Amino acid sequence: MAVKVNKEFCSFCGKRQDEVLILIAGPNNTYICDECVEKCYQIVRENKKTSYNFELKDIPKPEQIKKILDEYVIGQERAKKILSVAVYNHYKRIKAKEAGLSLDDVELEKSNILLIGPTGSGKTLLARTLAKILNVPFAIADATSLTEAGYVGEDVENVLVRLLQACDYDVKAAQKGIVYIDEIDKIAKKSGINPSITRDVSGEGVQQALLKIVEGSVVNVPPQGGRKHPHQEFIQVDTTDILFICGGAFVGLEDIIKQRLGKSRVGFEAEIKKVDKEQDLLELVEPDDLIRFGMIPEFIGRFPVIATLRELTEDELVRILVEPKNALVKQYQKLFELEGVKLTFTEKALREIAKEAIRRKTGARGLRAIMEDIMADIMFEVPSLPGVKEVIIDENVVKNKEKPKLIFEQAV
């Protein structure tokens, strides 16, 4: 008697009927097993979770955007207001276009943003938080790694590859995303007596290459990044509605502003001090100052919104340590809480940490490194110390590397 062979198997994973719990039949002798159904459902669920579709009514008003920025970014009030308005107007323009509203009578230009401020003043955090508020894809690129096509380094199109990767290559979502390009001041034109001796492959050439992307055009993007080659398939990305935010320290820009104001000459020093006291010199920046710095006019023209950030004060650095939702002190306190231990920082300790960040000229960015240095030994020791109920960090721990005070539970 012939043995009947069971030929039914899952068309997705190839497992036979006796290897799975359920095998569901479809048309044309196709089947899917319960395991693959569960995987498909999980994929659909994840895609819904990371959906970037949003309606105009879902875009927070400028006041709401700033309020959320306040939860993560301390200080920089003027910059937060400028960014809130610019981002709101940018996405309002997109939704008006999607709704089919006529914009023929007035051309609404894209509000790309240029952030100018010292290291650790919050430029990257502002851009990242904006993307989080709006639930849009976000990517960060470093301008120093970009070079002209044909030279060692990254093509400018690679900044769009990162954006595509951030939303699993959902082109429609990427086309509403935010790209932050850091250290944009490092691609300023080289200057000197004879600047043409060596080709400026990471300066003016990169600015020219970025022009096409930031102004809004359809760009051929290599899907896996890297250099383009003739046989490679490209993904077409329309950058018209992508918001580009560029940030840089622009060291020396203040001197250019002073020269323009005519306040670097003898007899005007008192007036310079007055300007410095009343408002940061950077707030007086004009496009011509950036052009003199080394940015090309066409590039600066693509960034109509300029927001300046000032160096953070000691008080603001202390607030950064304790106030934001992701404040470092809160994070360490939670880690100690999981060990059943209370962690306390004295006010003087927090101020010493802030002073050290100012001394290192690292701003808020350097706070974590300082905290890690302070906490490394005690975090190593506490889990092995029985009966510890509180750890107190005072100024001597920060300044003199002394041991923190330990409070133990009293034996019954």
UniProtKB/Swiss-Prot annotation:
Spell out the Pfam families in the cross-references.
Answer: AAA_2, ClpB_D2-small, zf-C4_ClpX
Q: Which GO terms describe its cellular component?
A: HslUV protease complex
Q: Which residues bind ATP?
A: P118, T119, G120, S121, G122, K123, T124, L125
At which positions is Zn(2+) bound? Answer: C10, C13, C33, C36
Q: Key word ATP-binding present in the record?
A: yes
Q: List the Gene Ontology MF annotations in alphabetical order.
A: ATP binding; ATP hydrolysis activity; ATP-dependent protein folding chaperone; protein dimerization activity; unfolded protein binding; zinc ion binding
Which GO annotations describe the biological process of this protein?
cell division; proteolysis involved in protein catabolic process
Q: Which UniProt keywords apply?
A: ATP-binding, Chaperone, Metal-binding, Nucleotide-binding, Zinc
Describe its partners and assembly state: Component of the ClpX-ClpP complex. Forms a hexameric ring that, in the presence of ATP, binds to fourteen ClpP subunits assembled into a disk-like structure with a central cavity, resembling the structure of eukaryotic proteasomes.
| Its biological purpose | ATP-dependent specificity component of the Clp protease. It directs the protease to specific substrates. Can perform chaperone functions in the absence of ClpP.
Q: Which family does it belong to?
A: Belongs to the ClpX chaperone family.
Q: What name does UniProt use for this protein? A: ATP-dependent Clp protease ATP-binding subunit ClpX
Name its species. Answer: Aquifex aeolicus (strain VF5)
Gene name of the encoded protein: clpX
